[in-house]
Amino acid sequence: VDVSDNVAISGDDADGVAVAAAGRQPALTGCPWHDVNEMLQAAGLRPTRQRMALGWLLFGKGARHLTAEMLYEEATHAKVPVSLATVYNTLNQLTDAGLLRQVSVDGTKTYFDTNVSAHHHFYLEGNHELVDIPDPHLVLQKMPEVPEGYEISRVDMIVRLRKKR
């Protein structure tokens, strides 16, 4: 990113499906199990039973934001035999592979976003919920000067909202 230019933030891709780290999207069939297998393989990850089950829970419902604890609870209800540590490890592997985007709200809460396109978020404080900002034309007018030897890897904007009193 050239810091002297304005940075335009684009919206979701057409169907909200995660894009592999290589920048290519696997062909989708509409079968979540097959699609998860294709996404994992395209990202260079072996489709283990646990990755497949967690991937199906993550990506089978479209674009969404989950914490590790939320996914673990879903897995437990779906009778997927995984530990919380396995959920954390899998989420980090999927993030490293470019299939998820990690969004830290504060020092204690991290969400994993299945929409890896460049976009920003509202954080609903009362509900502890992360929501995509729907404006695909949101633009940051001026970027800060970057210290020598560094480059901007990503810009995250989280607008915190609370109900009016």
What are these regions (language model features)?
Residues V1-H34, P136-R165:
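C-terminal regulatory/oligomerization modules of transcriptional regulators
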Residues A97-R165:
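Non-DNA-binding regulatory cores of transcription-related proteins
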Residues T67-K79:
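DNA-recognition alpha helix
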Residues L45, G60-R64, A78:
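Short helix-capping/hinge SLiMs at alpha-helix to coil transitions
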Residues A21-A53:
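Short alpha-helical segments that sit at the start of domains
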Residues V87-A97:
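Basic amphipathic alpha-helical segments that dock to polyanions
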